[in-house]
Amino acid sequence: GAWIQCVNGQFQGMPTEKMKKVLVSQLDNLQKAGINAIIFQVRAEADALYKSPYEPWSRFLTGVQGKAPSSMWDPLQFMIEECHKRNMELHAWINPYRAKTKGTGALSPMHPYSKNPELFVQYAGQLYFDPGLPESRKYICKIVRDIVTRYDVDAIHMDDYFYPYPNPGEEFPDNVSFAAYGRGFTRRADWRRDNVNVLIKEIHETVRECKPWVKFGVSPFGIYRNKKNDPNGSETNGLQNYDDLYADVLLWVNNGWVDYNIPQIYWEIGHSSSAVYRSGCDTHCIESGFDESEPEPDSGKV
């Protein structure tokens, strides 16, 4: 599989016909390389690279959030058609919690923050749905349901953006939601993990209810846990999904809540920990791939 993202701005303000030519050229090259699945980013910050009844057109498409493309074309529909012509799958890639990146100025009146600011928190200069709020999960599942119902996608895809990457010296501001919806948890870390677990389970159920043949997959950060913290972990000493992003990926795989898991292994080929990590994920990682363009800015992916 190959990822085609939008947040580096390579499509921003690009004329429709030129963008179509760029995408077709990428698909042709990827097909020649043997790629059979395209993971196309359609929701980067509670916006849309498709015609959404709930969220604004993305600034990463037109340059201004909420501004429709002049020809009223639909990039997601275009990519579905072009991928299927080539016997490729199209996986619609959404970022669930992130609602505003650092480079975004004014939000569209159609943006969910403009309508329901109580669902959001500010952290590290960005805006996020509060994962601790049941209404946040309900809203995200509504977006998933809309995409799966109206588009002939082969999968819904989420990458490594669960709780945000830690910002040194800043605590994620969820005191209010923890007090209101703590569900008896005494350790906040366990509660945060459960918030993400519930969302993953509910997205899985949403997809199955709409179209049972559509897959739901994730491409989380490449370290589940370091072995010094967990015997199931890898011989690594880096940031951990379980402890830092509150993503218990192993639980999702074991419970069948995701159809595929593609860890993002950003270290170089031949890294001393690579073989050890691979032996730990053979039964869980069913696809591999690469990013057609550069990693997202401020992503922590190095």
Give, region by region, the residue ranges found by the protein language model.
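Active-site beta-loop-alpha junctions enriched in small/polar residues
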Residues: 4-9, 43-45, 95-99, 160-163, ...
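Catalytic domains of carbohydrate-active enzymes, especially glycoside hydrolases
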Residues: 21-48, 150-155, 251, 257-261
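Glycine-rich, aromatic-flanked loop segments that form ligand/cofactor-binding clefts
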Residues: 1, 35-46, 74-122, 157-160, ...
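Aromatic-lined substrate-binding rim segments of carbohydrate-active enzymes
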Residues: 24-27, 40-95, 182-210, 278
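Active-site-adjacent "subsite" loops/lids of carbohydrate-active enzymes
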Residues: 3-21, 76, 81, 91-92, ...
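The substrate-binding groove and active-site-proximal loops of carbohydrate-active enzymes
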Residues: 7-17, 57-73, 123-141, 183-196, ...
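Glycoside hydrolase catalytic-domain groove-lining segments
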Residues: 171, 177-232, 236-302
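Aromatic- and acidic-residue-enriched segments that line the glycan-binding/catalytic groove
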Residues: 48-63, 98-124, 160-183, 229-239
